[in-house]
From Swiss-Prot:
The keyword Coiled coil applies. Residues 648-663 have a biased composition (Basic and acidic residues). GO terms for molecular function: RNA binding. The modification N-acetylmethionine is found at residue 1. Keywords: Acetylation, Coiled coil, Nucleus, Phosphoprotein, Repeat, WD repeat. Residues 664-688 have a biased composition (Basic residues). Belongs to the WD repeat NOL10/ENP2 family. This is Nucleolar protein 10. GO terms for cellular component: nucleolus; small-subunit processome. It holds the Pfam family NUC153. It comes from Homo sapiens.
Length: 688
């Protein structure tokens, strides 16, 4: 619930509160309600009190039990049972509804006016009958004594359809080209229609003759109002036997007594938007007038503002619940508005508990956020290395990105850059220190960025202040003190690159302009001194001197630009020669590709194992690699990541090495020493 106060009148917004994501399970919703106070305190007065896209009109039945609303897309009508606080039924329609009327006390008889000239009748069971009118309709009213429906629209005629006979009657011919709105007085049955020319025509249904004509367009123009176009009638409402309120497309509301052709009061919304609806509140003598931006409540006797209501979204229709302080709005948003104003009256019988709740659940307005989820785009996922999670339960697709659990996001963010929080903390501390320094007594010094430009501006400002002709010239704002250019002297991205080709070519012109400016200042000062001494001498200098001076400046500037261009061409030539020399000294070497560390290539035997490993989450893979000792993560000085993988031996290699080791030990153990054997010379005959 959101509470606002204007002129000490409290307005409770019952449809404002934290919205829960639709894809959350019931268990998570219950857990969120236990944990979050804002979610637990929100009030859902009527269940599913919304439209798929936009709500266009909203009305309450005469018995007060049913609330009917039309909207789009697809075009539909929804009926809500207030006694059950839920949706009773929903019916889809063939086209959008312009307006509708409830003919019975409940929802059993409804008439819809569509934007394709169709008139559709619905009974309690559903669709009953459909017919068409000759022109596009904009509004209609029901005359109970004669059972006639009066339709006005893009025609000068007012079409009459008798529901008792089931046929069209002779239309009423008005003097207007088109008619926008109409209404019937419930006391004496006077029929009034608002025209596109800004007039109101009143007709007697018994004689089918016009009995009055009001020129509201002329009366709506006051001394304070600014009118850019012809005001046309956009809203019309009777109250009692003698009072009528008229709303115009230029944002004025005129209050008339039927016995006079002059308005009793003219109220301007000051927005210049068409008045959409007008309602009377008899208990406090108030009038509720609404345009697409605001609902104003003002006294019909004095015109003094009582209070106003300004929703977040544009308004399409406003309905005041009978004999209560509840206000229903149809907005340019799926959710329909429910507002409770205790000063206007008590809460309706079906929600009498609001009187106690409004005293306990007052809270400040807060924006709707998803506290437990982080919204990330596809580019963010690529930077975090989480693109393989797309399609998994860890990511929920929403608009142009995904929702992910905030705990998982912080965990991955910490693994990608473990020192991000420390850097963020240091930046915040540095900003706080700079803010405290800025509050102290500041000395006149140059900014950190673009010092030369700032010095030039300061010198020019000082020269202007020293000169005596500054009084004749309109003072211009200084760039150094202008907030629009403040970033240019604080952000290093705006530093002027004096080594660039554009600056070097433009620099002679800038320097010559500054020299010319100084010379002109000196000449003007000398000229003013001469004028004081000799008043008869004419102002200025001879034209030939000016032309010679300008020609000399132009020649010097052209020579300087040519010189800078020659220097740039020489530098470019030297750079090309250096690049050519480097290319000649470069020796092409073969490029080798190695397998990832921690893996070995054994044909395609382990493809199933690798596939199973790749299907695991990033957290599980990191745990496995850290456990095996094949992965080590470290940070470099420039803020990037360095990953080191250790090649591990396979099980077959380990077994082979163990077998060789055992074989060597066994050979060593079974080996017999032959050190005791010595060679002896055999005796025999010597050869001669």
């Amino acid at each position: 619930m959101q509470v606002s106060s204007l002129n000490e009148v409290k307005i409770y917004s019952l449809s404002c509160g934290k919205s829960l994501p639709e894809w959350l399970s019931d268990r998570k919703k219950r857990a969120l309600q236990k944990k979050d106070v804002d979610v637990r305190r929100r009030i859902e007065l009527i269940q599913d009190f919304e439209m798929p896209t936009v709500c266009t009109t909203i009305k309450v039945s005469k018995d007060g039990q049913y609330i009917l609303a039309t909207g789009t897309y697809k075009p539909r009508v929804r009926c809500y049972d207030t006694y059950q606080l839920s949706l009773k039924f929903e019916r889809c329609l063939d086209s959008e509804v312009v307006t509708f009327e409830i003919l019975s006390d409940d929802y059993s008889k409804i008439v819809f006016l569509h934007n394709d000239r169709y008139i559709e009748f619905h009974s309690q069971s559903g669709f009953y009958y459909k017919t068409r009118i000759p022109k596009f309709g904009r509004d209609f009213s029901y005359h109970y004594p004669s059972c006639d429906l009066y339709f006005v629209g893009a025609s000068s005629e007012v079409y009459r359809l008798n529901l008792e006979q089931g046929r069209y009657l002779n239309p009423l011919q008005t003097d207007a080209a088109e008619n926008n709105v109409c209404d019937i007085n419930s006391v004496h049955g006077l029929f009034a229609t608002g025209t596109i020319e800004g007039r109101v025509e009143c007709w007697d249904p018994r004689t089918r003759n016009r009995v009055g004509l009001l020129d509201c367009a002329l009366n709506s123009v006051t001394a304070d109002s600014e009118i850019n176009s012809l005001p046309t009638i956009s809203a019309l409402k009777f109250n009692g036997a003698l009072t009528m309120a008229v709303g115009t497309t230029t944002g004025q509301v005129l209050l008339y007594d039927l016995r006079s052709d002059k308005p009793l009061l003219v109220k301007d919304h000051q927005y210049g938007l068409p008045i959409k609806s007008v309602h009377f509140q008899d208990s406090l003598d108030l009038i509720l007038s609404a345009d697409s931006r605001i609902v104003k409540m003002w006294n019909k006797n004095s015109g003094k503002i009582f209070t106003s209501l300004e929703p977040e979204h544009d308004l399409n229709d406003v309905c005041l619940y009978p004999n209560s302080g509840m206000l229903l709005t149809a907005n340019e948003t799926p959710k329909m508005g429910i507002y409770y104003i205790p000063v206007l009256g008590p809460a309706p019988r079906w929600c009498s508990f609001l009187d106690n709740l409004t005293e306990e659940l007052e809270e400040n307005p807060e924006s709707t956020v998803y506290d437990d989820y982080k919204f990330v785009t596809k580019k963010d996922l690529e930077n975090l290395g989480l693109t393989h999670l797309i399609g998994s339960p860890f990511l929920r697709a929403y608009m142009h990105g995904f929702f992910m659990d905030i705990r998982l996001y912080h965990k991955v963010k910490l693994m990608v850059n473990p020192f991000a929080y420390e850097e963020y903390r240091k930046d915040k501390i540095r900003q706080k220190i700079e803010e405290t320094r800025a509050q102290r007594v500041q000395l006149k010094k140059l900014p950190k960025v673009n010092k030369e430009l700032a010095l030039k501006l300061i010198e020019e400002e000082e020269e202007k202040q020293k000169s005596t002709w500054k009084k004749k010239v309109k003072s211009l704002p200084n760039i150094l003190t202008d907030d629009r250019f403040k970033v240019m002297f604080e952000n290093p991205d705006f530093q002027v690159d004096e080594e660039s080709e554009e600056f070097r070519l433009l620099n002679p012109l800038v320097s010559k302009i500054s020299e010319k400016r100084k010379k002109k200042l000196r000449l003007l000062e000398q000229q003013e001194l001469r004028e004081k001494e000799e008043e008869e001498e004419p102002e200025g200098k001879p034209s030939d001197a000016e032309s010679s001076e300008s020609s000399d400046d132009e020649k010097a500037w052209v020579e300087e630009v040519r010189k800078q261009r020659r220097l740039l061409q020489q530098e470019e030539k030297v750079k090309r020669q250096e690049r050519l020399k480097e290319d000649q000294q470069t020796v092409l070497k073969p490029q080798f590709y190695e397998i990832k560390a921690g893996e070995e290539f054994r044909s395609f035997k382990d493809s199933a194992t690798k596939q199973k490993l790749m299907n695991k989450t990033l957290e599980d893979r990191l745990k496995i690699e850290a456990k095996n000792g094949t992965l080590s993560v470290s940070d470099t000085t420039v803020g990037s990541k360095q990953l080191t993988f250790t090649l591990k031996r396979s099980e077959q290699q380990k077994k082979q090495q163990e077998a060789e080791k055992l074989h060597r030990q066994e050979r060593k153990r079974l080996r017999r020493s032959a050190g005791h054997l010595k060679s002896r010379h055999k005796r025999g005959r010597s050869f001669h």
